[in-house]
Amino acid sequence: MIELCLMKTFLNSNYATPGSTLLIDGPITYPFYFPAETSLTWSRDKLKTYSDSLEFLNSERVKIVDRLMKQGVLVVGIVKRLVKSYYLSSVDPAKLSVGRINDEAYIMMLLLRVNKTLEKPFIIGPIRVKHETSNITRLMWYIVVPRRIYPITSGMGNFVSYRVELLENNSHRKDYVLEQIFYDSFHTGSLLPLSLLVVDRRVKKITSSMVTYLLYMTGLTEESTGQYISVL
């Protein structure tokens, strides 16, 4: 919800000008996903509330993204953690036939199949994915970047992978989208888009300060820190 408020603030600001780019730390729309424990602990009413809330958030996000695109703003989602998404194995662009595995595992299997040391970045995509519960369609690219100029034996620690996505009806040229991402990463000497890394670091500091202040005001012990961090 906070992210939605920030997107609305950006929409109404002087920064949302034609030719500008908005990078979202995460997907353009949230996947229709229920935590594993919900099937055992949540009531039917609570599940419906969660589902309705998720659909509302997605519809509001898409409205904002549509308005930004009409203003000439490029809106791109960057997903850094691929262990909970399964788009690659569902579409299977490399014809690996490995069953349902997460995106990170799929990329690893692809590198093992080609049996080649990753010496330079490569791209998987674009992949067209329709949302589970709506008519929203996204285009996705997976960027795989080696960590070292001279990699050691192939392994997950030798490369960084992340997903770039945008709405299919985006009017920007697809090569222009990737150019923006590459400029903010490779051209700045970073494996991931530098803008997101800077913001992520600032957010963690702000969150840490909020937790410290909460513990100070409530008089909670340090042992309670973990619990309240998870709540925040």
Segment roles from a protein language model:
Residues 2-232:
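Long, contiguous domain-sized segments
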